[in-house]
Each structure stands twice: as structure tokens, then as C-alpha cells.
Amino acid sequence: MIAQEYKKMLGAKSVIREMFTYGTERAKEIGKENVFDYSLGNPSVPVPEKFTKKMIELLETESPVALHGYSPSLGIDSVREAVAVSLEKRFGLPYKKEHIFMCSGAAAALAHAFRAVTVPGDSILTFAPFFPEYNPYVNLTGAKLKVVPPDLKGFQIDFEKFETMLTNDVTAVLINTPNNPSGIVYTTETVKELARIMEKKAAEYGHEIYLISDEPYREIVF
């Protein structure tokens, strides 16, 4: 028997998915060049030529087992080291290999992060509007996703509502900037005030409140 909760989740309506399916079917009818698909986040920008050449080189010279086999649980050491060096260079923070956990995509990374900082009965706080798949990722941990209503003036954070909802059961705050679906980027002032309130509440409750920052669109600039 299929669990009813999972069956309900799989059967939930997704307007974005419906738009994508419709766009795919229309492309077959009138040609792909005549369909502008703004549904799923599939970037159309080509990958850097340097990356493509390196992939071809590895396919032609490396052992298939090394390329396609299992990696260590935390990721290949040399890759983790390279990511740490890149992050330190770009953001000026003291990242080390030990801080890096490689995942197969952002969804897996979020699922691991949620599981790492919650136990059943805890809550994670995020802000509307938000990526709807956060809900099942959090629910699978036994925790609950609580949503702070949006600041409709500028889609930054309504700090009065945020502080009210940052209760003792909240173990993590999830932000997404640039935001999906609004495209809003949080200002420096917004992030600093967010951190101030989180630190104050963590001291008040006597436990850590972690900040999880989902940034898949950070590198995309128009």
C-alpha cells in the first residue's frame, strides 16, 4: 500500500509543471523557436567553453571507473578543497575543505541541511513567497515549515511578523535570495537585521538557530 500522505503529495497540482508540459506540447505543434517557456528554471546560457573542453579531456583520458564510480560520502577531497579555495577567494571567509559537503544538486543539499538541524516536532521558518518544494523536504524530516507573510511594499522581510513567529521550536531560518519566484534580492540591511534578531532569540531560548541560505540564482545577473 502506498502511504496516503506521499500519494497526496505526488498528486498535488503544480501550475509551473502544467505550464512546462503545455509549452513542450506546443513546441511540437508550432516549433520550439515559437515558444517562450517561462515555467521551469532551465537557464539557456551556454556553459563556459573551458568547462566543456575539460569534460571532453577527462572522458578521453581518465578511467571510466574514476569518472563514473562512487565518491566518498562527503565528496572527493580535491573537489572539496577546490570549492573551499574558490569560496574563500570570492567571499573573503576562511573556508576549509572540512566545511564542504558535496551533494548531487541543491534539492539533496537542502534535504541534508534540514535533516541535520531538526528533530521531529521542530520548525523551520521561511518567507513568502517561497519555492513550494521546501514543504515536502521539511515534512520528510518530521519538522514543520512555518511561513512568514510577505512585506508587500518591497518584498523584503517584515521583521515584526518574523520576530513574533521566531518561537522556541524554530531551529533554522531558511532564506532564498535572489528569490524564487519574486526575483527580489535581500539588501545588506535586511540580512544584518535578520541576523541580529536570530542571535537575540538564540540567546533567549538557549539553543542555536541556524541560517540556511538557498542561493541557486546568485550568479545570474540580467
Task: Show where each model-derived region lies.
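Conserved core of the PLP fold type I
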Residues: V65-G206, I212, R218-I220
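N-terminal small-domain helix-loop-helix segment of the aminotransferase-like
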Residues: I2-G105, H112
